[in-house]
Amino acid sequence: MDYKTIRKRRVMTYFIEAADEIIKEDGISGITIRKVADKAGFNSATIYNYFENLDHLILFAAMKHIKEYALALPKYLYNVDNALDRFIKVWECFCYHSFKEPEIYYAIFFANLDKDLSEYIGEYYKLFPEEIGVQPKEVSTMLLRHNIYDRGMALVDECVKEGFIREEDAETINEMCTLIYEGILQKVIKNKIDTDKA
């Protein structure tokens, strides 16, 4: 990394860690530009040199929480030898981690952002490549996809290639999984369903 990138990463890390502390103390709804700047020891205006808006900063702070999921995936996939089992295990791992921190995962995958999420995720992993861990090719492709629908589709496509799912059913199956997941995640956030039952 060149000096400019190192400096950018360092300053962004101050803001991300400050936002992460606020998430732990007050939840995502407690994050404001002023609170983050004060905690990081900077002027509020400085944040806008590194982040487009508050949602961009919240996304990056939330991405730190997805690291646990990314690092847990290899354990879930240890003895998996086909695409269908991989599909099931990735969803199992994803649900386990996302239902523990539903607001974080909602902020990442269902946020209302200015740019395409893939640009933000690409930028994040370019600055913090260690956050993604070491993953099999199929899984790293899925992790780098820009939205939850495309992430799921990467797994479903592998099931189609191996003959577990008919090509004409692929999009429907993926959409059903995504919609069911989003509905359950919202119920967990609203405390309408217990995390253990989800």
Briefly describe each language-model feature range.
Residues 137-142, 147-149, 157-198:
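Hydrophobic/aromatic-rich alpha-helical bundle segments in the mid-to-C-terminal region
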